[in-house]
From Swiss-Prot:
Protein known as: Serine/threonine-protein kinase TAO1
Phosphoserine: modified positions: 9, 421, 445, 965
Known partners and oligomeric status: Self-associates. Interacts with MAP2K3. Interacts with SPRED1. Interacts with TESK1; the interaction inhibits TAOK1 kinase activity. Interacts with MAP3K7.
Physiological role: Serine/threonine-protein kinase involved in various processes such as p38/MAPK14 stress-activated MAPK cascade, DNA damage response and regulation of cytoskeleton stability. Phosphorylates MAP2K3, MAP2K6 and MARK2. Acts as an activator of the p38/MAPK14 stress-activated MAPK cascade by mediating phosphorylation and subsequent activation of the upstream MAP2K3 and MAP2K6 kinases. Involved in G-protein coupled receptor signaling to p38/MAPK14.
Amino acid sequence: MPSTNRAGSLKDPEIAELFFKEDPEKLFTDLREIGHGSFGAVYFARDVRTNEVVAIKKMSYSGKQSTEKWQDIIKEVKFLQRIKHPNSIEYKGCYLREHTAWLVMEYCLGSASDLLEVHKKPLQEVEIAAITHGALQGLAYLHSHTMIHRDIKAGNILLTEPGQVKLADFGSASMASPANSFVGTPYWMAPEVILAMDEGQYDGKVDVWSLGITCIELAERKPPLFNMNAMSALYHIAQNESPTLQSNEWSDYFRNFVDSCLQKIPQDRPTSEELLKHMFVLRERPETVLIDLIQRTKDAVRELDNLQYRKMKKLLFQEAHNGPAVEAQEEEEEQDHGVGRTGTVNSVGSNQSIPSMSISASSQSSSVNSLPDASDDKSELDMMEGDHTVMSNSSVIHLKPEEENYQEEGDPRTRASDPQSPPQVSRHKSHYRNREHFATIRTASLVTRQMQEHEQDSELREQMSGYKRMRRQHQKQLMTLENKLKAEMDEHRLRLDKDLETQRNNFAAEMEKLIKKHQAAMEKEAKVMANEEKKFQQHIQAQQKKELNSFLESQKREYKLRKEQLKEELNENQSTPKKEKQEWLSKQKENIQHFQAEEEANLLRRQRQYLELECRRFKRRMLLGRHNLEQDLVREELNKRQTQKDLEHAMLLRQHESMQELEFRHLNTIQKMRCELIRLQHQTELTNQLEYNKRRERELRRKHVMEVRQQPKSLKSKELQIKKQFQDTCKIQTRQYKALRNHLLETTPKSEHKAVLKRLKEEQTRKLAILAEQYDHSINEMLSTQALRLDEAQEAECQVLKMQLQQELELLNAYQSKIKMQAEAQHDRELRELEQRVSLRRALLEQKIEEEMLALQNERTERIRSLLERQAREIEAFDSESMRLGFSNMVLSNLSPEAFSHSYPGASSWSHNPTGGPGPHWGHPMGGTPQAWGHPMQGGPQPWGHPSGPMQGVPRGSSMGVRNSPQALRRTASGGRTEQGMSRSTSVTSQISNGSHMSYT
């Protein structure tokens, strides 16, 4: 366990700042225990620095559950530091000493429950309204700061001497709203607090419910169901209707206020701010109503304490002589007079720890502590200035006369115009008046009984404490499981997001690599085409040079042959003069040379035209080849994008299935845990109820045994009583006999006295015999009647107890059945909500996939359209340039024999598919004839003087010149079969099977 969580550890600076470093034993003196509870004890003390009276609550954080106790102390100190309001207890500081926290607070007179205890009757409606108004103001302050008190009751509503109402005991409070802890005092708990772990969270409206119960408590001296077992009261509150005021004497405003506070459904219950506008608290009432009530209570406390004091003095002096007794009586009267002036003090705090003390002395002792999250309820000791005689359990401390005069000068009724907001001057005066003494509205017997009940009710209190501890542990286990599953879910979600991000990054890298590869391929193709064009030109030029040389050789041979023929013709004709022959021969030579020169010029011109035409054709074929390559590369890129998108969508669907499976598994785990905790809770509740039943039966049997044991004494007492009555009767008869005898003796002659005496004696004997018979009959009848009455009374008590316990057990079973049904309904609701969330998430995912696929298809179509349009523009621009240069489009579109000529070295690289195979055609199925898109291709024009060539057998309709012909492009752009053929396959398998040369059909 971390050191910061260990009980008493101050290593955490934030925790260390909560406590003062001084030694509290040196700062506070005259400590006297004035209250006790399960948390520890409350003491009256005086601050040596200011001589001010304070209340100190000592809370130990050692022993069992030390860590929980320490956390509760820290929480309460933090809460007290945060609140500053006239209607909340003033916090003065906290000190640590020997594993005990000293919580120092202002000192108040007592609680509203003390008023009920002292007066033994309900409060008046105007008094209840004043107390409720002050409590509501404090609650409105807490609720406005998202805090919940969670233990509102009369014992936690304190009063000061100026009549100010203050909320106390924040040990159960929550600094966050909403909350879901099972805390508070059973009889005052709201239904949503009892069902907190089963049905969810609650907010500050639980304090409004508790305030309504407190109003009934002030109006009827005890809260509803107080005569019921505390555990049974919980079950009753959770499933039965809200309580109401029983008496008809209360006003409609009060009834409506209580009914509003006790609305079973929290949403129908008003807030504390809304209740401050209710007519019940806004009605006009005397400003001194609480001051007068406090003064009457103090007077009553003084009378009760003086009565106890006189009883004690009577016991002390009952054996003394008359003289000392008279002196003691006189002294008692003088002291009574002094007490009447100065008053008494029995300072104790509110009795939050033992609710039975906040009711009456005769109320049952089965009430339990109000516990906070980890320990029992703490009572904030209330106490301030006031009366001047301090009573401990066995002594009375009198004050000096000058203190009495100072008390009279500082009478709060002469300086407190507003009981809710006393001025600072009165506070300053009360501070000095409060230096030497403190006042109270509680009797000494109440303090003593509080301590005794705390010791006697330990078993019941421990049972409730254990039950609340179990509920907190169950809630902690459930929260721990939920946090664990939430962390697992977050980790799983992060892992899935990371996998998806990794895949997307890999896809982006692959696509970037592919684009770079395509760019390199285009650059390489451009270089190859430039080299091919250069080689093509060189090849044609070489052929033309060879043809020219051959032509020149042929001309030389022809010239030589013609020259020889001419010479032979001249030689045959001997008649022609030699000179003429020479001239004719020269002229013929010149003609031959001129003709040959013209033929040579014509050949050179034809060769130049052929070279220009073939180069232009070659460039067009290169352009078409580049377009085909671009189409192949774009097709490969789009197919790659399609494959990646399909793989990404497949991963998203797998992740959705994985998240769905994990969510259902987590929900099942939480629901199983909740069912198990409910089972354990119900088992504990049943065990506690059975133990309570056994304890009640055991107590009743013990009571009956004591009655049986006490019966002989009772019978003896009855017999003595009858005997005394008989003796009295005998004495009366004896006196009557004597009076009658004297009368007869006086009225009868003396001679008859003997007979008269004998007759009277016989009559007396007969009457005494009858009286003796009556005495025996009375004794026997009394014995039989008493035994029968005892048996009948005990049997009736047993029957009543059995019926009561059976009703409580049935109430528990009904409560547990309701909890199980609510849990099942909650589980079904959670399952339906999860299914709806999963279905919605799946629908959104599928919609997203569909939108992405549609966007990808649109992008694909747009890319293809823009590519074809650009290529069509390039072809059109090229053809326009060709027309300007004097080339016919028909001639350029028809393939020359050299289109597939491989006769020159290295001429094969430009005409093959750069991607490794014949790519598919854009706009027609694979294997389909391109004749559907272009005109039949005829062989190229025969070269001059070369009717046959190596490219004479070129197949008609070759795709080289068709795929990007203007006619095909125009058909594609105008929406021919190409658009239907561009529909892509959505299957990853079809793409992979077709590879990068996938058909767009």
